[in-house]
Amino acid sequence: MSAIEQTAEGLRLRIFLQPKASRDKIIGIHDDELKIAITAPPVDGAANAHLLKYLSKAFKVPKSAIILEKGELNRHKQLFIPEPKLIPEELQPLL
């Protein structure tokens, strides 16, 4: 499976998360996963919540619509984003 899988219902992302970064940013592909840096620390679910907030803004979908399928307590995550309204510039060449 590649880092980004486009389906009729939406996008499935395989993510490598880098918490406690200096800024929120989609870095690119890292070992067949999409590397995303976020500023939140990996404590008490703060990194997951921040990641969902960041992706909801990037894809213009509600936070509650994004589904964390795998990796709640891990840096390696799999998310499903139903019917994104916008594809971030960093991801367009990867689709």
UniProtKB/Swiss-Prot annotation:
Domain of life: Bacteria
Pfam families, per the entry: DUF167
GO CC annotations on file: cytoplasm
InterPro entries: DUF167, YggU-like_sf
Sequence similarity: Belongs to the UPF0235 family.
Cross-referenced HAMAP family: UPF0235
Protein name in the entry: UPF0235 protein MS0322
Originating organism: Mannheimia succiniciproducens (strain KCTC 0769BP / MBEL55E)
Lineage, top ranks: Bacteria, Pseudomonadati, Pseudomonadota, Gammaproteobacteria, Pasteurellales
